[in-house]
C-alpha cells in the first residue's frame, strides 16, 4: 500500500501515481452549465468540490494531491469530490488517467442556452467575490449600484478587468472558431468522456437542478454517489442562486466607527456567512423587494444605533433609498440580458458563423 505522506506531490506526478483515494466521485462541470449552483447544492448535502485551476504541467494534480493528504481533508466529516471545470491544461490526459476509478458526474446543458449564458456572464467591477463597502455619506445610489460588467468580450475571451457594460453578441463569431481556447471551458467534453469510458458515468441535465426538480435530482444522486439526502426543508434548493442580485451583494454599509450594516442574499452561489452574534433586522426596512434579501448587523452595533434615534432614522432612510436603487439596477441589468432568441437571430443573419458553430456541436454531441 502506498504511503502518500512520504511522497512529495511533484514526485508522485512524475511517478504516475493515482491521486490518494479520499474522494467519492469526479464532477465534470463546465462553465455556464450550472456549475456554480451544482457546487453549492453539493455543499449543502455535505460534499465539498475540490477544484483546481492552472494550465502548467501537473499543477492541478499537485494542488489536489496536497489537499487530499492534508488534515483539512483527513480530519473532516465532510465528503469530497474532485471538480473538473475546464479541460485547458497541459497533459490533461495524464491528469485524467491518474484519477481513481470513481463514478463521474457530468452536468449538461442545451448548447444554445449555454452559449446565451456565456455571453451574459457578469462580475462586479471590483471583483466577483469582493464585498463592496459603502460609506453612508455617499448618496449617489445610481453610481454605487452601477458596478456590473460583462466579462466575455467580443473576442470571446474572459477579461475580469473589462469595462464592458453590455453583453456582446459578437463573441459568438469568435467562438465559432473550433480552435478558440474558451471552448475548453464550456463546450469540449468528448475527450474527457473518452478518458472515463470505463467508469460509471452519470449525466445530469442542468434543468434537473432548477426549482422543484433539484430535490428529486439530489435524492437520486445521493443513492448513487454515497452522500446524504437533501433536507426537504432547506429553501436553498428552490432558489435561483446566480442573478444580478448575486453580483451586487453582499455589501457593507458603514454608518460610523461603531456601526456597520450588512446587506446580503439569504441564498447565493457565494458562501455568505452571517457573522456570529449578528441579528436579522430585515423587517425594519419597507423597501425589501425580494425574499432573498437579508439585512443584519452585530447586536452591539444595533444597540448603539437604536440608542440614537436621529441616527437610526437616518440609517433607515438611507438603506431604503439604497434598496430602491438596487431594485432599479437589477431591472436594468435584466433588460440587457441576451435571450436564446437573440442568439438564434444572430445565427440566422450570419449563416457562415452558424455553420461553423454547428460543426463544433456536431463534433461534441
Q: What positions do the PLM features span?
A:
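PAPS-dependent sulfotransferases, especially Golgi type II membrane carbohydrate sulfotransferases
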Residues: 1-18, 224-365
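Extended amphipathic secondary-structure runs
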Residues: 25-28, 40-41, 178-224, 322-338, ...
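PAPS-dependent sulfotransferase catalytic domain
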Residues: 1-235, 243-275, 279-281
Amino acid at each position: 500500500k502506498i504511503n502518500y505522506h512520504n511522497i512529495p506531490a511533484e514526485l508522485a506526478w512524475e511517478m504516475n501515481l493515482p491521486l490518494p483515494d479520499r474522494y467519492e466521485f469526479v464532477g465534470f462541470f463546465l462553465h455556464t452549465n450550472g456549475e456554480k449552483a451544482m457546487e453549492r447544492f453539493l455543499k449543502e448535502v455535505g460534499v465539498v468540490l475540490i477544484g483546481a485551476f492552472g494550465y502548467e504541467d501537473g499543477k492541478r494534480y499537485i494542488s489536489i494531491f496536497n489537499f487530499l493528504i492534508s488534515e483539512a481533508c483527513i480530519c473532516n466529516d465532510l465528503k469530497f469530490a474532485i471538480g473538473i471545470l475546464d479541460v485547458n491544461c497541459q497533459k490533461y490526459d495524464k491528469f485524467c488517467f491518474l484519477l481513481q476509478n470513481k463514478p463521474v458526474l457530468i452536468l449538461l446543458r442545451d448548447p444554445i442556452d449555454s452559449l446565451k449564458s456565456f455571453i451574459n456572464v457578469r462580475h462586479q467591477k471590483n471583483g466577483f467575490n469582493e464585498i463592496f463597502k459603502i460609506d453612508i455619506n455617499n448618496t449617489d445610489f445610481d453610481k454605487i449600484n452601477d458596478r456590473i460588467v460583462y466579462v466575455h468580450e467580443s473576442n470571446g475571451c474572459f477579461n475580469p478587468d473589462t469595462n464592458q457594460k453590455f453583453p456582446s453578441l459578437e463573441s459568438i463569431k469568435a467562438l465559432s472558431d473550433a480552435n478558440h481556447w474558451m471552448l475548453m471551458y464550456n463546450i469540449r467534453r468528448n475527450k474527457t468522456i473518452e478518458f472515463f469510458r470505463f467508469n460509471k458515468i452519470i449525466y445530469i441535465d442542468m434543468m434537473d437542478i432548477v426549482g422543484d426538480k433539484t430535490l428529486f435530482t439530489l435524492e437520486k444522486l445521493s443513492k448513487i454517489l454515497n452522500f446524504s439526502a437533501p433536507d426537504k426543508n432547506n429553501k436553498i434548493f428552490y432558489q435561483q442562486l446566480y442573478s444580478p442580485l448575486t453580483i451586487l451583494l453582499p455589501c457593507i454599509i458603514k454608518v460610523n466607527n461603531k456601526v456597520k450594516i450588512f446587506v446580503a442574499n439569504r441564498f447565493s452561489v457565494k458562501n455568505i456567512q452571517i457573522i456570529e452574534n449578528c441579528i436579522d433586522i430585515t423587517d425594519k426596512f419597507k423597501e425589501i423587494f425580494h425574499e432573498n434579501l437579508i439585512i443584519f448587523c452585530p447586536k452591539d452595533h444595533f444597540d448603539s444605533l437604536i440608542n440614537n434615534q436621529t441616527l437610526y432614522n437616518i440609517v433607515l432612510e438611507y438603506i431604503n433609498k439604497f434598496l430602491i436603487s438596487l431594485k432599479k439596477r437589477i431591472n436594468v441589468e435584466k433588460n440587457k440580458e441576451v435571450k436564446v432568441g437573440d442568439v438564434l437571430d444572430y445565427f440566422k443573419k450570419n449563416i457562415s458563423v452558424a455553420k461553423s458553430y454547428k460543426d463544433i456541436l456536431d463534433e461534441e454531441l
